[in-house]
């Protein structure tokens, strides 16, 4: 995904966690609105949750990159959740984002290495 930005560097968004809060649309929006029973670790009236598992920064070719590993879950228990790896940088007035994901079951059956390779191989010339 490529979007215009007035930022000069990815670090202008703040920490990786602050960056994610500004682009949280990447994780999807909760479609259901209404009262729900709070169970399974979900907040009251919430049917989806996202947890940041890991963040890091790295400089490649003079550009700072953010790497984020996020586990999202929905109340329906869809595959136990999704592992979403997000790589982002800023160059030439544009925000570049690569998101790779796999369902929890597939993640632990071997998809992890492919998703990680896709996310870590992303770079902007």
UniProtKB/Swiss-Prot annotation:
Keyword Cell wall biogenesis/degradation: no
Keyword presence, Cytoplasm: no
Alphabetical list of Pfam families matching this protein: PsbP
GO CC term, one of those recorded: chloroplast stroma
Gene Ontology terms, MF aspect: calcium ion binding
SUPFAM superfamilies: Mog1p/PsbP-like
Domain of life: Eukaryota
Residues the record lists as Phosphoserine modifications: 15
InterPro entries, per database record: Mog1/PsbP_a/b/a-sand, PsbP_C
Transmembrane regions listed in the UniProt entry: none
Keywords: Phosphoprotein
GO biological process: photosynthesis
Matches recorded under Gene3D superfamilies: Mog1/PsbP, alpha/beta/alpha sandwich
Disulfide cysteine pairs (residue numbers): none
The family this protein is said to belong to: Belongs to the PsbP family.
Protein name as annotated: Putative oxygen-evolving enhancer protein 2-2
